[in-house]
Amino acid sequence: MVTMRDLLECGVHFGHQTRRWNPKMKKFIFGERKGIYIIDLQKTIRYFRYTYNIVRDAAAEGKTVLFVGTKKQAGVAIKEYAEKCGMPYVNHRWLGGMMTNFGTIKQSIRKLEVIEAMEEDGSINLLTKKEALMLRRKKEKLLATLGGIRNMKSLPDMVFVIDTVKEKIAVAEANKLRMPVVAPIDTNCDPDIVDFPIPGNDDAIRSVQLFCQEMAEAINEGKALRDQDEAEQVEPVSQEEKDEVVAEAMSEADFEEQ
C-alpha cells in the first residue's frame, strides 16, 4: 500500500497555480509555495488507503472497475494498469453516451468484431480496394475508441478517473447512473462529484502512474481474495445426494454378501 515517501517522490503534493483553484478544495490544501498550492499529504494518505480498501473489496465481490483517462499524461498508464488487473479502460477519447447509451456502444463493438471476422475468413479480400481500405480505417478508429471496453458486456460497477475536469462527461454519466466514482482530485477539481476522492496531483506523469498502479494492486488483491474464497467454498450437500449415496452403499454391500 502507498507510503508517504511514494507520495513525495511522485510529486503528488503539487497542486495547480493559486489562480486556478476550486474553493471546495480548501480543506485539502496545506499551504502555498511560489504561487502553487501544496496539497496536505496527511489527508492524501488517509483518503488513499481508505479508497484502496473500497476498491479491493469491490473487486473481491466480482465488481468491474472502468479505468478512464484520455489526456496525454494518463493514456499509457491507464491502459497498462487496467490490463494488469484485467479491467476495461478508455484512454483515447470518451464518446458521449458511452455509459448512458451503452446499447449503441455495444452495436459499435459488434461492428468491430464483424470487420475482424471478415479479415479472418478472407471475405474482406473480395471487396474493392477502396471498400477494404475504408473498412480497415473504420476498424482502427473503433479499436482506438472502443478497444479497451470491447470485452465489457455490461455497465461497470465503478469508475476510476484521472482528471475529473477533463473527463467531466464520463463523471457526469457515472453520477447520473449512480455509479461510484474514484478519482485523484487536484486543487482545481470539484470534490463533490467524486464518491471516493484522493487529494493529489492529477497532471504529473509519475503521480498519475502511482494512482493507476495502486488501483490495479487493490483490484488484484481483491481478486485474489475472491479466488481464495471460492476455493474454500464447499458445495452444500442435498438430501437427494445423501439418499443416493446410502442406496449405492447398500447395493454394494448386498453384492459383496452374495
UniProtKB/Swiss-Prot annotation:
Gene Ontology molecular function, alphabetical: structural constituent of ribosome
Record-linked InterPro entries: Ribosomal_uS2, Ribosomal_uS2_bac/mit/plastid, Ribosomal_uS2_CS, Ribosomal_uS2_flav_dom_sf
Protein keywords: Ribonucleoprotein, Ribosomal protein
One Pfam family named in its UniProt record: Ribosomal_S2
Gene Ontology cellular component list: cytosolic small ribosomal subunit
A Gene Ontology BP annotation from the UniProt entry: translation
Region feature Disordered, mapped onto this chain: 222-258
NCBIfam families: rpsB_bact
Family statement: Belongs to the universal ribosomal protein uS2 family.
UniProt-recorded name of the protein: Small ribosomal subunit protein uS2
Source organism of this protein record: Campylobacter fetus subsp. fetus (strain 82-40)
Gene: rpsB
